[in-house]
């Protein structure tokens, strides 16, 4: 109770609070940062055995998902069967790592390894792993014998872990040591953050995408300075965004500078859970628990207290791009040509041309002839 009061007091004051302990419900790994963690677990088992202990007692205490998605290299492109060829090369290069991960899944409890070629960890997280609301494992019940229900939360070893914030799952990226501790059931320490509210109104205009909203967020939040803050979206405009649009906005959290960009649960969330194959019982549980906990998006509810509130009318968001080097340097698409010429002038780029031959045809290219989009 005393800890809860300190957290609430710090939040109301709009100040960073003292250090508190946080125990996430699960941990998400990708292969580049996750493999060293499971190597550590294996070494711990060896050390335990050397000391005369039972090595099988060394196990993750919370569900851990590791998705192999960072090893992909597109060696072959532009032809039929190129995906299969790239997969063969990937297994050839990473056979030892994949053998180890297969052993880890078979040897440790609470571990699920997703093989390569299944998708990106953050997309799989919101489609398959996240439950929004969780029930305690068998054998862990309340005083009356019923299961304990609690919110799904996570930490991940990738900076874009907040993608899950889009469907109402609190989570953020951490380092390998913190993820390892969380997997072993140890709480990680964090400071009580300032919570910034972003009140959304209006609806997106035709032709405006969630990425345009993300770039607007990046510009807006970087100007305010939200490093170390939690950002929570609320207001009538939330209902205008689908769950996948919200996930796209939350995915860009590292570019905003904040720790997470959290959306509440509503009917759009439930629609997404149904679309991705969650059971009717799970969807009903999410709805009931979110409403009971005041986590349901209700524009008519009494306003919450935030350290700061930022307003954004979605109808004012324009098709945009960013750059040339920073995601928060937003440029309205209508002004892209003008801004490009200005950048060329600022950098002293002349009107040089280059001749290239493509399929027997000769082309004269100038600066700006080729555009590459990172999505």
State each model region's role.
Residues 1-375:
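Fe-S-dependent hydro-lyases/dehydratases of central metabolism
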